[in-house]
A protein has these predicted regions:
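Iron-associated oxidoreductase/ferritin-like identity signal
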Residues: 1-58
Length: 58
């Protein structure tokens, strides 16, 4: 189950990065910053899940 959640986080990060690039191309600075904040949050979630999975498997 955690593996699926981790994959979902990684997919979200990829999508947000794409959206941030689109916002940048449209000079939507505020939107880009908001999306970058989401990327930070999702990255933290993914890293936490990776740690949990690593600790659980050892």
């Amino acid at each position: 189950m955690l593996e699926l959640a981790l994959e979902a986080e990684r997919n979200a990060i990829r999508r947000y990065k794409r959206r941030a690039a689109q916002a940048d191309a449209l000079d939507e600075v505020a939107l880009k910053v908001q999306i970058e904040d989401l990327i930070v949050d999702e990255t933290r979630h993914a890293e936490e899940m990776e740690r949990i999975l690593t600790d659980w498997k050892t």
